[in-house]
Amino acid sequence: DDLIEKTNSILSSPAMAPERTKACTAGRKCIYYEDCFDDAGLPDDSTLFLTTSKNKLEAYNAGAEHIKDMDPDLFEGTPLQYAQYMASRKERPFCDYFALSAWNEQIEFPISYLDFEWDTFPIPPYDEMKPFDVLCFQYSLHVEQKDGTLSHMDFFSTGDCRKHFVESVLDNIPKTGTVLVYNMEGAEKLRLQQLGQQFPEYADRLEQICSRMIDLSRPFEHGVYYNSAMRGHYSLKNLLPVFSQDYTYKDLEISDGMNAVFAYRNYDHADAQQQQIIQHAIRVYCMMDTYAEYVVYHGLLDHMRQL
């Protein structure tokens, strides 16, 4: 009875007001963060969106609502933090024109916008695979010609589709020009190198593609360009609405990579009609990724023209 009484007393007591601490976002953001705090109500240049900052909470609690209001001594001084500060101070996007121009000079037509989807297997299901190797089951490829023509190709398969995947990539990616990829080192470039190890007969041709890759994330990761509307994040999903209001991931049946993997895992267990639905949803999602790369890249070009 005493325990029940104490429990009822706790349940009837007013809820404690949530208090922001470093533990809320240390490592990964707490899964209950949105239950406690409404970041949607914060200004785009909120101090809380300052990247890789150990002192932003201290500054915010001291009354610095905007990044431009922070004590300069509290900044760690990274290039991205500088870009965020300048965007907040000037109240417009920050762009290092010369750095962005130098980056853009590397890019040559035709431009191949490339994105993969893959699953990870703790126990290797096929020959030449090691524990926790990945298997690519989907790619999307938009190819932009110098005259502005944009074409799209893709691939989807299940089972041991690695060789078919490689052959399709080699057939469809142009032999010249830039392969523009978002966050390539830990993703598409690494995947092609792994496939080259598994299929040595294709290694040289796959490495030739890797040698032409340029990472679209670099201008954002290194603070060459920053728009406060990014709110401290620079994934493709965050960048797309910054550069275009016409396209969004929100209405897609599959709207993120993990859901694409879950759908792929269920594919073989679905009936024929459901398989068509799954395949279409995965293809549309991956196609959105490469089209987002196209939109973001041209958004950078448009911004440079305005400077």
Predicted segment positions?
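Conserved RNase H-like, two-metal-ion catalytic cores of nucleic-acid enzymes
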Residues: 98-175, 197
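Flexible loop/turn segments at secondary-structure boundaries
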Residues: 78, 119-123, 148-150, 186-191, ...
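Acidic, Mg2+-coordinating catalytic module of metal-dependent nucleases/exonucleases
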Residues: 1-45, 239, 243-307
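Conserved DEDDh/DEDDy metal-dependent 3′-5′ exonuclease domain
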Residues: 1-4, 152-258
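Generic beta-strand/beta-sheet core signal
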Residues: 62, 114-117, 142-144, 181-183, ...
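Helix-hairpin-helix
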Residues: 42-86
